[in-house]
Regions:
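C-terminal, non-catalytic macromolecule-binding modules
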Residues: 248-303, 800-857
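Long hydrophobic segments that form regular secondary structure
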Residues: 236, 307, 787-788, 798, ...
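Glycine-rich phosphate/pyrophosphate-binding beta-alpha loops
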Residues: 182-186, 255-270, 340, 358-364, ...
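Short, small/polar residue-rich loop motifs at catalytic or cofactor-binding pockets
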Residues: 235-238, 337-340, 787-790, 877-879
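Active-site bordering "gate/hinge" segments
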Residues: 1-231, 236, 240, 245-248, ...
Length: 963
């Protein structure tokens, strides 16, 4: 941050010297009083809520949306926040303040016949959960939302309009927030957004109007206010700011960036996350000294409409959000508010008419000049506001207002077409019992039956006149839980223990098995699924996304066929179908235990990370845990029905080291497990962290290799694995790549030819559970396409390539699946990939492991070299370590190069020596895999060289452990 500040300061000085002077002559930063404030520690009871009870309540509330199956969705959610913020600065301010807040959001959405999306929302905010409305009240509100959104769906679309309007308290609150509140934010008045800067002391609103921002208000009009705080994010005490008094502009919202005439902060410097504070709104309150009844304001509107020759005026009842441009950076000084419910109020007294598709637009001064009157009762709009300093909680409070002239535009037309099929109803029972008698539990059954029944309906009925029907469908769903823990120097940085969630993917193909609509392999549509929603929720999720996927694939199929008609494939490629047919299969694998003890993992991470306190040269040190358990389900239209549980838990250790030459090096290692139960003890993990730290620190004063070296090099441990995995386990190598063109770079072209040293065999084990006492994470019994693979798949024999691995997607060099489709480990991207299970590099004609170094030295002597080199990498390490070995004495010492280049595949055709010892490694990247490989190999004619390292200036302030 100091370096960044210096850079910005230099840029500011240059800007002052090279650009026209700014009209505002105020300083860049203002003084502020020293504050001392300490909120009492948060009682433990606030950190825990009865999740089961709240889930029951939310289910009861959201069930009200089931009254109308055609709604796209209906949700009730609770966000509960407990935070404790610490603010200190060099001036002596020390502020500690708490925020405990609960917010329930109700949301539903319909789609009109023309594709227009029609969302409707309602929220409740309270600083005490017991103060939230009763469930009965929220159910009533949800039912009312259903009626309103259905009415909105059938409402006519409004055309662009100018004329009089009324804005409800909620709508006018958002209106004032967007067009006025943002233009009161002081930092915007420095340059660009200066709409009201020179209007201080002038009438900007009717003289009856008062506008102020007051972050000290916790309640207003019987409602808790979201913009409440005691101190802002610069440690300045919050205070009320009277922006408009009797219609006259008096003041702006100030952070510690001053303006001419406003030299100090008034407690509105706000931010979120790691962004710099700027002046932001808090609780914006609009009041009037001369309130009118709604009937009086309606009469005003009708009279004004007649005066302007308009048939009607508008009443804006609810809005969802808005945005504004304040003129900064050359932007247009304008605003756009997005109403949800808008009514025409007819001048002749006819009943109001609901319309949709209205956007309220304009420029602030013009709009303000037409504000005429305000009502009696205030409404509260709760929200969060996004700007350059992040998202901050805000509130806008206003009565209904009457405006003599507004402007609207017609909302941009959506390309979305309503679903072809009607939504599946609620409360139906599965139409089949195919999963009875399997290992499926009740949760499995609700998911699988939901997927299967909706797929049958879609396959039977999904069609658009004149377009091809789907010939193939595949649904993926994963039910998962995750854990993420990080600790630094013995302190917990974060712990995210996320409960069960769900996500899916939908594939709907048109065309045929010979030529389908995929433009790329795995053309799925990510599918949001309500966690815990059961059979009905599963069906509705796949109904929505099947329709989207079908329409997308109709377009991609037309695009693909047009391209192929214009550019016919070569005969050898044309005969290859896009897909392989699958035989029906049902395999439901039982779930297994994955017990997350977040406290235990947090304690373990803290203990292990504390080890770094003994290594003052290492910075940015951390120990973290990352894991997920997933039950992944797949159902296809070929009657492939699968459930596969899979999981991982990864320990990551990382650190930075500033080397003697000024360059900064990052390093780390990881350990991979299937479940938390396999994690080693604190003592073992601490020992591994210490070993890593000692090896890393030893690099600090190691010089860079000055001369280019070309000769024999021994690759040891993981460094002996990388030449094989990096050269072979990628698409177009041992993994077949789908491409609708001749593929000259495909490794498959070399089937039957030499690619490795004749002493090397490579076998892919699929179901092998362990090897010489080590558990293999790569073991699997059936692949993600439902194919049972061979237990051993020979890939290379005596250096000759025998075959490559593939899924159910024929390619030029792999026409059939080898059972190598795997579900990926990322629960946020449910997909399939091609992968090995256990990759075994076997060798004959090996050398005893303890003689490998002698072989290396012998080769060096033969070449009359003074030194030879060894590259090693401990299990899971991120970087490689280089050792220089004296040919005469055998002495080893650390060396360093700036770029480590692994051997190419062609260099592996002749390996000088291969260790008889084998190492076993478990890896967890896209999928869980295992590797069995010789512990070392020696290759000749390897080139090692270095570039000049990039030196970085040391921090101006020493790392705390180095002081």
């Amino acid at each position: 941050r100091y370096k960044y500040a210096c850079q910005v300061f230099d840029e500011a000085k240059t800007k002052v010297a090279t650009t026209a002077a700014n009209e505002d002559k105020a300083a860049c930063f203002s003084d502020a009083p020293v504050e001392k404030y300490y909120d009492a520690s948060i009682d433990n009871r606030f950190y825990h809520i009865d999740k089961a009870d709240w889930l029951k309540k939310l289910n009861e509330i959201s069930a009200a949306f089931k009254a109308e199956p055609e709604l796209l969705g209906g949700e009730a959610s609770l966000t509960y926040q407990v935070s404790r913020v610490y603010i200190v600065n060099t001036e002596g301010t020390e502020v500690v303040q708490n925020r405990i807040c609960g917010r329930i959001m109700l949301s539903t959405q319909a789609v009109a016949a023309d594709g227009m999306s029609l969302p409707l929302n309602k929220d409740y905010l309270a600083y005490d959960l017991d103060s939230l409305p009763t469930v009965e009240k929220m159910v009533t509100d949800a039912k009312d939302m259903v009626k309103r959104v259905l009415a909105l769906r059938n409402a006519p679309v409004a055309d662009p309009y100018t004329g009089p309007a009324m804005l409800s308290g909620e709508a006018s609150g958002v209106f004032f927030h967007e067009i006025f509140g943002h233009r009161l934010e002081g930092h915007r008045l420095k340059e660009g957004g200066e709409t009201f800067k020179k209007m201080v002391g002038e009438l900007v609103l009717p003289k009856e109007f008062q506008v102020y921002c007051d972050p000290t208000l916790r309640h207003y009009a019987g409602t808790d206010l979201n913009g409440y705080y005691k101190y802002d994010d610069e440690g300045v005490k919050a205070r009320r700011v009277n922006n408009v008094v009797n219609g006259v502009l008096k003041s702006f919202l100030m952070s510690r960036v001053p303006l001419d005439g406003f030299p100090e902060s008034n407690g509105h410097g706000r931010t979120s996350d790691d962004k710099d504070p700027v002046s932001r709104q808090s609780n914006l309150i609009v009041e009037t000294n001369k309130p009118y009844t709604e009937a009086q304001m309606r009469q005003m509107l009708r009279a004004e409409a007649k005066k302007q020759g308009k048939e009607y005026g508008y009443y804006f009842k609810t809005v969802t959000s808005g945005y504004t441009y304040t003129g900064e950076g050359g932007s247009l000084n304008s605003f756009n508010v997005t109403p949800l419910e808008v009514y025409r109020i007819f001048a002749d007294g006819r009943p109001d008419q609901l319309v949709r598709g209205v956007d309220l637009i304009g420029t602030p001064l013009s709009m303000f000049s037409h504000i005429s009157a305000a009502g009696k009762n205030a409404s509260v709009f709760t929200g969060v506001c996004g700007a350059e300093s992040g998202w901050v909680p805000v509130t806008a409070v206003s009565p209904t207002i009457f405006v003599t002239q507004i402007e609207t535009q017609r909302r941009a037309k959506s390309n979305y077409v309503p679903a072809t099929l009607k939504a599946p109803g609620f409360g139906r029972k599965p139409s089949t019992n195919v999963f009875e008698g399997t290992d499926a539990n009740n949760i499995d059954k609700s998911i699988l039956y939901g997927m299967k029944d909706e797929m049958k309906r879609e396959m039977d009925s999904l069609t658009i006149a004149g377009s091809p029907r789907p010939f193939y469908m595949s649904y993926l769903a994963t039910r998962f839980k995750t854990i993420n823990v990080k600790a630094e120097l013995g302190g917990l940085t974060y712990c995210y223990d996320m409960p069960w969630d769900m996500l899916g993917s939908t594939q709907v193909l048109v065309g045929s098995f010979k030529r389908n609509s995929e433009l790329k392999l795995g053309q799925y549509v990510q599918t949001g699924i309500q966690a815990g929603g059961g059979y009905d929720a599963i069906r509705r999720a796949f109904w929505t996304y099947s329709d989207l996927a079908y329409k997308y694939n109709l377009n991609s199929y037309a695009q693909k066929m047009n391209a192929l008609n214009s550019n016919p494939l070569p005969a050898a490629i044309e005969k290859i179908p896009d897909m392989q047919r699958m035989a029906p299969v049902t395999v439901i694998q039982p779930s297994y235990d994955y017990n997350i003890d977040a406290q235990k993992l947090s304690d373990l991470a803290c203990k292990a990370s504390e080890t770094f306190k003994d290594f003052k040269d290492l910075t940015n040190t951390s120990v973290s845990f990352e894991g997920a358990y997933e039950d992944t389900y797949r159902v296809t239209s070929e009657n492939v029905n699968l459930k596969e549980p899979h999981s991982y838990l990864k320990i990551k250790v990382s650190a930075n080291l500033r080397l003697a030459d000024g360059s900064l090096q990052k390093n780390g290692f990881e350990m991979n497990f299937t479940t938390p139960e396999e994690v080693p003890s604190a003592e073992i993990l601490q020992a591994k962290v210490r070993e890593f730290a000692e090896q890393f620190v030893a690099l600090k004063d190691v010089p860079i290799l000055s001369d280019t070296y070309k000769g024999p090099v021994m690759f040891e441990d993981m460094a002996a694995v990388y030449p094989f995995t990096e050269n072979l386990l990628t698409l177009n190598k041992l993994y077949a790549k789908v491409i609708l063109a001749p593929n000259d770079k495909a490794l498959g072209k070399k089937i039957g030819k030499k690619i490795l040293d004749p002493r090397i065999d490579i076998v892919n084990y699929t179901s092998l559970p362990e090897y010489k006492g080590t558990k293999l994470m790569g073991a699997y019994s059936i692949d993600a396409d439902g194919i049972k693979p061979e237990a051993e798949i020979p890939l290379v024999e005596k250096g000759i390539l025998k075959q490559i691995l593939n899924r159910a997607t024929p390619t030029e060099h792999a026409m059939h699946s080898t059972g190598s489709a795997r579900f990926t480990n990322n629960p946020r991207a449910v997909a399939l990939t091609t992968s090995v299970g256990t990759f075994h590099v076997k060798a004959t004609g090996t050398t005893d492991a303890d003689k490998m170094k002698k072989e290396l030295i012998k080769l060096g002597k033969k070449k009359k070299l003074e030194y030879v080199y060894k590259i090693t990498s401990p299990a899971g390490a991120e970087s490689l370590q280089l050792y220089q070995i004296n040919v005469k004495t055998g002495e080893e010492k650390l060396a360093r190069i700036t770029q480590a280049i692994l051997p190419t595949l062609s260099q592996l055709e002749k390996i000088t020596a291969i260790s008889s010892k084998e190492n076993v490694y478990n890896l967890s990247k896209d999928v869980n895999t295992s590797v069995i490989c010789p512990s070392a190999i020696i290759l000749d004619n390897i080139e090692l060289s270095s570039n000049t390292p990039r030196s970085e200036k040391a921090p101006a302030i020493p790392y705390p452990l180095q002081r």
